Amino acid sequence: MRGVARNMARHQITANNIAISLTETPATQSWLADEQRMKATMSKYIVRRPGRPNDIANMALFLASNASEWISGQTYPVNGGFTLAL
């Protein structure tokens, strides 16, 4: 990501990425339906719930807005605190 940000900076373009974790989507619906697996998995998350599409969308909207114009080359974990629990 940092290399992309360096290359794009000369064009006044910022580059960042979002590192997501388990998120409620149609593709994860059957996996999330297993209560025992969910309980074990969510015990590793500070927030204790899977992500929702809006959780990721809100970060993407921020990074696409003028509010983030001075941010580049960063990775943002949007994962319910999973990386804090490691």
Regions found by a protein language model. Give the residues of each.
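Alpha-helical segments that scaffold the active site and NAD(P)H-binding pocket
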Residues: 1-10, 20, 61-65
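Short, cationic motifs built from Arg/Lys/His that form the positively charged side of catalytic pockets
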Residues: 2, 14-16, 48-49
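Short, small/polar-rich loop/turn modules that mediate ligand/substrate recognition or access, typified
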Residues: 9, 14, 71-73
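A glycine/serine/threonine-rich, flexible loop-to-helix segment
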Residues: 10, 22-45, 86
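Conserved SDR Rossmann-fold cofactor-binding beta-strand/turn motif
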Residues: 14-24, 64-67, 77-79
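Glycine- and other small-residue-rich loops at beta-strand/loop junctions that grip anionic moieties
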Residues: 21, 48-49, 74
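A conserved structural motif in NAD(P)-dependent oxidoreductases
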Residues: 45-56, 67
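Short C-terminal tail/terminal secondary-structure segment
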Residues: 61, 72-86
